[in-house]
C-alpha cells in the first residue's frame, strides 16, 4: 500500500514539474498564430438585435482604412522616397534600355506603316507637304528674300558652272535656226517688213544719202539713175506679187545660205566670249532679277505650284520607297542611339523636377491605400500568416523556447516551495 502511495506521489510530482514546460512551450509556440487570428477575427461585426458585440469585428478589419493610411505613409516616407524614386528612374532609364525601347518603337512604327492598308500615313504626309508648299515655305521664302545675300552664292555658282559654259549643240542650233526662219521670220514676214520699211520718206532718205555719200562710178549711177525708182518698184512688186515675192525671198535665203550661217552663229554664242566686265555685270543683273522675282512673286509661285501637284500620289511613292529603303532600316539604330543620348542629357538636368511632378500624378500613396482597402481581411490574414511561416519562423521557434524556459522556471519554483 505504501509502494502504491509512493508511486502516485512521484507521478504527481513529476507531472507538476513537467506540465509547466510543456504548457509553456505549447503556448509560446502557438501564441503568434493565435495573436494574428485574434487581430483579424471576427472578420465582420456581430450583432445581437441592433447592438453590436464589443471587439467585433477584429482590430484590423475595424481599423483597415487607418491601417492602409499608416502603411502608405510608412512606404512613402521610408521606402519610396523622392531620392529612391530618382534612383529607380535612373536604373529604368539607362541609355541601353532607352535605346532599345526607342528602336522597338521605330520598328513598330515602320511595321505599322507597312501594314497600313488605308494609306493613312500617306494622307498625313500629303497634308504636311501641302501645308509646307502652300503656307510655311512661301512665308519662309518671303522672309529670307529680304536679306541682301539671299541665294547670292547659289545663283553665282549656277551662273558660273551652267550659264557661263552653256553652248548650243549642233542639233539644238539647227532646230533653233529652223524655228527662226520658219516661224519668226518666214518669207512672208520678211516681205511685209520690207513693205513697211519702204515708205516714201524712207525711200527719199535712202536715195538722198546714196547720192551724197557715193563717189566715182557709184556717184554717176546714183545721180543719173538714183535708187528711188528701184525701191518704189520693189515695194510695188512685194505688194502686187505676194506669192512670187515670197518665193524670190525664199530663194535668196537659200542662195545666201542664211540657215547655215545662222546655225553657225548660234553655235558660236557663249558668255565666255564676252568681256569680263560684261560677264560680271550680267551675273549681277541675273542675281538681282532672280531675287526681285522671288521677293515679288516667289510666294505666289510656290502656292500655285503646290496646288497643281498631286501630293497624295507623291506621298504614296515616298512611303513605298521608304518601306523598301535599306538606308532607313540601317539608320534606325543610329537614330535610336542619338535620341537616347538626348534623353539622357535632358534627364541629367531635370530628373529631380520630373520625379517631383510625377509623384502627385502617379498618386502612389493613394494606390497603396486603395489596394489595402480593397483586400479582404481573410486575404490580409493569409498574407501575414504566409510571411510569418516563410520568413519569421525563427520568431515562432523563439516563442516556443521562451515558453519552455518560463515553464522550467515555474517548475523550479514549485520544487523549492
Swiss-Prot record:
InterPro entries: DUF445, UCP032178. GO terms for cellular component: plasma membrane. It is a multi-pass membrane protein. Keywords: Cell inner membrane, Cell membrane, Membrane, Transmembrane, Transmembrane helix. It comes from the Bacteria. It is found in: Cell inner membrane. The keyword Cell inner membrane applies. The chain crosses the membrane at residues 11-31, 395-415. Pfam families: DUF445. Belongs to the UPF0754 family. PANTHER family: UPF0754 MEMBRANE PROTEIN YHEB. This is UPF0754 membrane protein PCC8801_0398.
Amino acid at each position: 500500500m505504501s509502494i502504491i502511495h509512493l508511486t502516485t506521489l512521484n507521478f504527481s510530482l513529476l507531472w507538476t514539474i513537467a506540465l509547466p514546460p510543456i504548457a509553456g512551450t505549447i503556448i509560446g509556440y502557438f501564441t503568434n498564430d493565435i495573436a494574428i487570428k485574434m487581430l483579424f477575427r471576427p472578420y465582420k461585426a456581430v450583432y445581437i438585435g441592433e447592438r453590436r458585440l464589443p471587439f467585433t469585428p477584429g482590430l484590423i478589419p475595424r481599423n483597415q482604412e487607418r491601417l492602409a493610411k499608416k502603411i502608405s505613409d510608412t512606404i512613402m516616407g521610408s521606402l519610396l522616397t523622392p531620392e529612391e524614386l530618382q534612383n529607380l528612374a535612373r536604373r529604368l532609364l539607362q541609355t541601353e534600355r532607352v535605346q532599345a525601347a526607342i528602336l522597338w518603337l521605330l520598328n513598330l512604327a515602320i511595321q505599322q506603316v507597312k501594314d497600313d492598308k488605308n494609306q493613312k500615313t500617306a494622307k498625313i504626309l500629303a497634308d504636311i507637304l501641302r501645308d509646307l508648299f502652300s503656307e510655311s515655305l512661301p512665308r519662309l521664302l518671303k522672309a529670307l528674300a529680304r536679306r541682301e545675300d539671299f541665294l547670292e552664292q547659289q545663283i553665282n555658282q549656277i551662273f558660273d558652272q551652267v550659264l557661263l559654259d552653256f553652248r548650243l549643240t549642233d542639233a539644238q542650233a539647227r532646230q533653233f535656226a529652223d524655228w527662226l526662219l520658219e516661224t519668226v521670220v518666214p518669207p512672208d514676214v520678211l516681205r511685209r517688213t520690207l513693205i513697211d520699211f519702204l515708205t516714201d520718206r524712207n525711200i527719199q532718205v535712202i536715195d538722198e544719202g546714196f547720192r551724197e555719200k557715193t563717189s566715182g562710178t557709184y556717184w554717176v549711177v546714183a545721180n543719173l539713175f538714183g535708187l528711188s525708182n528701184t525701191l518704189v518698184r520693189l515695194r510695188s512688186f512685194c505688194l502686187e506679187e505676194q506669192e512670187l515675192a515670197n518665193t524670190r525671198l525664199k530663194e535668196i535665203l537659200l542662195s545666201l545660205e542664211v540657215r547655215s550661217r545662222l546655225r553657225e552663229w548660234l553655235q558660236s554664242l557663249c558668255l565666255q566670249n564676252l568681256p569680263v566686265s560684261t560677264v560680271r555685270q550680267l551675273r549681277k543683273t541675273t542675281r538681282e532679277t532672280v531675287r526681285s522675282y522671288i521677293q515679288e512673286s516667289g510666294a505666289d509661285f510656290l502656292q500655285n505650284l503646290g496646288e497643281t501637284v498631286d501630293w497624295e500620289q507623291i506621298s504614296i511613292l515616298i512611303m513605298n520607297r521608304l518601306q523598301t529603303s535599306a538606308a532607313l532600316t540601317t539608320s534606325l539604330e543610329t537614330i535610336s542611339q542619338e535620341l537616347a543620348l538626348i534623353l539622357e542629357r535632358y534627364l541629367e538636368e531635370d530628373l529631380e523636377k520630373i520625379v517631383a511632378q510625377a509623384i502627385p500624378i502617379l498618386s502612389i500613396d493613394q494606390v497603396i491605400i486603395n489596394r489595402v482597402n480593397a483586400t479582404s481581411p481573410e486575404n490580409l490574414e493569409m498574407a501575414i500568416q504566409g510571411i510569418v511561416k516563410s520568413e519569421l519562423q525563427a520568431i515562432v521557434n523563439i516563442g516556443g523556447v521562451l515558453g519552455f524556459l518560463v515553464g522550467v522556471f515555474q517548475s523550479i519554483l514549485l520544487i523549492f516551495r
